[in-house]
């Protein structure tokens, strides 16, 4: 399986990288991004790893990664990442 990002997930990751670099410096932000990519690779290898959660319109999977949650669905042979949100954000309202 491969992982794919929605436009919202790309924007989320861009925000995470920019804020991380601003608050913690480039090297820490880059390590955090590498950890996030490693988790995405893990999810592509084991797409059922995260538990299913019921959102208002669909069932999604939620995998914590650092201070963030990766919200995704399994579609055919791909892991489609819907959003990457901070753990304190209300993910149900933001899907």
Please annotate each region the language model reported:
Residues 48-77:
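Basic/aromatic recognition patch in beta-strand/loop cores that engages polyanionic ligands
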Residues 30-37, 62:
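An alpha-helix initiation/capping motif
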Residues 9, 36, 72:
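GIY-YIG nuclease signature motif recognition
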Residues 68-95:
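Enriched for short, Lys/Arg-rich terminal
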Residues 41-45:
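Short proline/glycine- and basic residue-enriched helix-capping loop/turn segments at helix->loop/beta transitions
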Residues 16, 36, 46-50:
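Alpha-helical linker/hinge and terminal dimerization helices associated
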Residues 1-33:
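Arg/Lys-rich, positively charged N-terminal/basic patches that mediate binding to nucleic acids
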């Amino acid at each position: 399986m491969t992982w794919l990002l929605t436009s919202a997930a790309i924007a989320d990751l861009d925000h995470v990288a920019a804020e991380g670099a601003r608050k913690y410096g480039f090297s820490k932000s880059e390590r955090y991004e590498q950890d996030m990519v490693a988790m995405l690779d893990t999810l592509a290898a084991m797409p059922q790893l995260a538990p299913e959660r019921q959102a208002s319109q669909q069932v999604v999977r939620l995998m914590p990664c650092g201070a963030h949650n990766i919200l995704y669905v399994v579609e055919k042979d791909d892991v489609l990442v819907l959003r990457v949100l901070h753990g304190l954000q209300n993910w149900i309202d933001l899907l």
